[in-house]
Every structure is written in C-alpha cells, then in structure tokens.
Amino acid sequence: LKLYTYLAPSKVCDGVGVFALTEIPKDTLIWRIFPKEYHKYKWEEIPNEYEDYVTNMTFCDEEGFKIDCDLDRLYGAYYVNHSENPNVRIGKNDEYISTRIIYKDEEILYNYPPQDRIWQ
C-alpha cells in the first residue's frame, strides 16, 4: 500500500490523530485493519473486569475481540478518531477506504458504531 498518512495532535480531541500526507482520492484503500496474523477470542474467555480494557485496546464485536499478533507495529487505524462526519469507512475485508477526497493535512475520521463509543 502507498503511504498516505502521518500522526499528529488531533484537531477533534485531546490526543493523537491520523492526517493525510497527500491528497487521497475517493474510494482509496488506505490500510487494512488486521495484519496477516491475529488471535480471535470470545468474550467468555476473559474475566468481566477486563472487558472495558479490552474494548479500549482491541477491535471487537458482539462475538468477541481480535488482538494483533504484532503490537510492536502499530499502524494508523489505532489512532483514527470518531466523527459524525467521517471521511473513511470500513470495507468488508477490514480495510479503511476513503469516502471522498481527503485533502493534504486533513484529519482522517471514522464514525464509530455506537457500541464502540466507550468514552460516552
């Protein structure tokens, strides 16, 4: 994949965000969420007191969660912030795809599903 992004202080929250290094055309595959290897776990495999931590640090759904086998290699998807006006979507094969032209230095934003909005 072509390098399209960089990390910098977010413009929408107190933290880090992902920004366009160059103009990104509409319908461009920016990156895949999951690398070649990850472990999938069911919710019943962990104690209830760890659920909040797991939802903060992994990709999860109603069935369970996935942990990247190579967390030494974090990529942009870990730093994408929420917006009601997103400029990316998640494709059927777990990839981030631009929904419109994303301009150079514009923050990349995704509309998290309600169950993923843990800060609310």
Locations of regions flagged by a protein language model:
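Conserved catalytic SET/PR domain of SAM-dependent protein methyltransferases, capturing the structural core
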Residues: 1-120
